[in-house]
From Swiss-Prot:
Keywords: Chloroplast, Hydrolase, Lipid metabolism, Plastid, Transit peptide. Acyl-ACP thioesterase involved in the production of fatty acids and beta-keto fatty acids. Can produce fatty acids of medium to long chain (6:0, 8:0, 10:0 and 16:1) and small amounts of medium to long chain beta-keto fatty acids (8:0, 14:0 and 16:1) when expressed in a heterologous organism (E.coli). Possesses thioesterase activity for lauroyl-ACP (12:0-ACP) in vitro. May play a role in the development of floral organs by generating short chain fatty acids. Its EC number is 3.1.2.-. The keyword Lipid metabolism applies. The gene is ALT4. It is found in: Plastid, Chloroplast. It comes from Arabidopsis thaliana (Mouse-ear cress). It is an enzyme of class 3 (hydrolase). This is Acyl-acyl carrier protein thioesterase ATL4, chloroplastic. It comes from the Eukaryota. Expressed specifically in anther walls (endothecium) and in microspores. Belongs to the 4-hydroxybenzoyl-CoA thioesterase family.
Amino acid sequence: MIRVTGTAAPAMSVVFPTSWRQPVMLPLRSAKTFKPHTFLDLKGGKEMSEFHEVELKVRDYELDQFGVVNNAVYANYCQHGMHEFLESIGINCDEVARSGEALAISELTMNFLAPLRSGDKFVVKVNISRTSAARIYFDHSILKLPNQEVILEAKATVVWLDNKHRPVRIPSSIRSKFVHFLRQNDTV
């Protein structure tokens, strides 16, 4: 018990509960290891080695009070790179949304390695690390140009949602676009 006294106010007591416990700290989950393209069964279990690249430049309004890109902005960079990649293989996220379905990021893990500052040019690299019936797993890297310094590494899980926002299997018309892209990548 702590007793507080003073001349301006009457004495009062503050009692801390005796049953209070320190919170339990759970260990962080380790990075998941995936078998690539399990539902497509392509490439004999090899990863897609080609990255789709999008070049961008840091804008002043993306900076925080310390003069570096705010951490939350990197999620936008990753999502933009992913949308550009999907569009390059014939999947338009806006059209998917207008149809009532959605592609939603259900998990995003980012490892910040170095900062970006105003005016920096950089490239967002995106590839598919794995797919399942209802999910697509992406790997992202952000590299500062021109020296290719690694700024960020990220992993994203994207879920295909129906018009009631429930996870569903990726439609066969979309799945065929992944198959076409991966087969085309194999021949290059």
